[in-house]
Design a protein with these regions (language model features):
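Alpha-helical recognition/docking segments in bacterial nutrient-uptake
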Residues: 78, 83-197, 256, 263
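Flexible loop/turn connectors
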Residues: 255, 263-340
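Extreme N-terminal segment that seeds HTH/winged-HTH DNA-binding domains in transcriptional regulators
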Residues: 1-45, 133
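An alpha-beta-alpha
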Residues: 193-234, 328-340
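Short, Lys/Arg-rich nucleic-acid/phosphate-binding segment
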Residues: 36-37, 69-83
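N-terminal helix-turn-helix
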Residues: 32-69
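Short beta-strand elements in bilobed, periplasmic/extracellular small-molecule ligand-binding domains
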Residues: 110-122, 212-216, 231-247, 255-256
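Hydrophobic alpha-helical segments within soluble ligand-binding/sensing domains
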Residues: 176-213, 290, 305-325
């Protein structure tokens, strides 16, 4: 029989330690669906704590859907395999147009009824931790976009917090935290390397132009990673590259731009304004980073390099439908339209 370790000298309440210990055992598979857990009396005696403390922990675990009480038999690890609906917590850094595409794709493919909750943590690790603490054990699936500051301490803290969620309930979207392992689900892009895959699909034209002007946002979370890969790609292929934080005042005929900010940000708008009198796609060229449905009509078709956010949502829905989790890197490509 599994043993739980409780530290009565810890600042953490004993009942909370027990809740976390049982949740972790379920996450790791040490306790399996349908398995009987120790009775309240037996566990109280084993841990030398009060029965009321065990009762409080078991009640919380039952409320959170981790355990279920069976009349006259005791507490068992909950088995949700026969449910005809799922509860889903979308825990997103922000609800951008791209996150909307993920959610839209998810519901296009999902074959069971879902009860969704969405919480936004704005890349704030403390708020993220609060949301996890408040909602641990309450949902069938936790779909998380783990975008935080890239410093080591924050990344390690994020990983530690996320690992509190049972693997079989955890699905990561958009980004994998380096070094994070486990049998959780994931549908993601590779922020450091994918940009080269997209640019490769326009290589012949870029070589004929000879130079790529990159309009970037200095505060972008992954800007430095993406810029480093762009620099390497251009160097390897003999293409001159220049990075700028805003659109140039004068756009010259033959200029090619990669806009790393959103298609609705000032970078693209200023660029088009400063190129009045010239025809985009003929006199000068624009590639935008990240694709959304509106790009099909912007400038009669805005060329993008992007992962497929809709497919990302579809892939995680396939996991929920199959009740089996896996990891998949979503294809990154150039969507060729009017502007390039």
């Amino acid at each position: 029989m599994i043993r739980f370790n409780i530290d009565t000298n810890s600042k953490a309440a004993v009942y909370r330690q027990l809740v976390d210990a049982v949740t972790e055992a379920v996450r790791k598979g040490s306790l399996k669906a349908g398995e009987l857990v120790p009775s309240m009396n037996a566990l109280a005696d084993e841990l030398r704590i009060s029965k009321e403390t065990v009762k409080r922990a078991y009640n919380i675990l039952s409320k959170n859907g981790i355990l279920e009480a069976r009349q006259g038999k005791g507490f068992y690890v909950a088995d949700d395999s026969t449910k005809d609906s799922v509860s889903v917590l979308f825990l997103m850094d922000k609800f951008s147009i791209y996150k909307q595409e993920i959610v839209h794709g998810f519901h296009q493919v999902l074959t069971v009824k879902s009860e969704d909750t969405m919480l936004l943590f704005n890349q704030d690790i403390s708020l993220f931790e609060y949301f996890i603490n408040e909602n641990l054990g309450r949902y069938d699936y936790y779909i998380i976009s783990p975008h935080f500051s890239l410093d080591q301490n924050t990344q390690e803290k994020a990983m530690k917090i996320i690992k509190r969620i049972p693997n079989q309930k955890l699905i990561i979207v958009d980004r994998l935290i380096p070094g994070m392992i486990g049998n959780f689900g994931a549908a993601y892009q590779d922020f450091e390397n994918d940009v080269a895959i997209g640019l490769e699909q326009g290589l012949m034209k870029l070589k004929s132009i000879g130079k790529l002007n990159v309009i970037t946002l200095p505060a972008s979370l992954y800007g430095s990673l993406i810029q480093r890969k762009i620099s390497g790609f251009c160097q390897e292929n003999g293409i001159e590259v220049e990075f700028m934080s805003c659109a140039p005042e004068k756009v010259r005929k033959g200029d090619a731009f990669l806009v790393l900010t959103s298609q609705l940000d000032p970078g693209l708008i200023s660029l088009v304004d400063n190129a009045k009198g010239m025809s985009v796609g003929t006199d000068y060229y624009i590639i935008s980073y990240n694709d959304s449905p509106i790009d099909r009509v912007v400038l009669n078709g805005l060329t993008t390099i992007s992962t497929d956010f809709n497919e990302m949502g579809r892939e995680i829905a396939r996991m929920v439908n199959a009740k089996t989790l896996w990891k998949k890197h979503i294809d990154f490509k150039m969507n060729k339209r009017n502007t390039f």
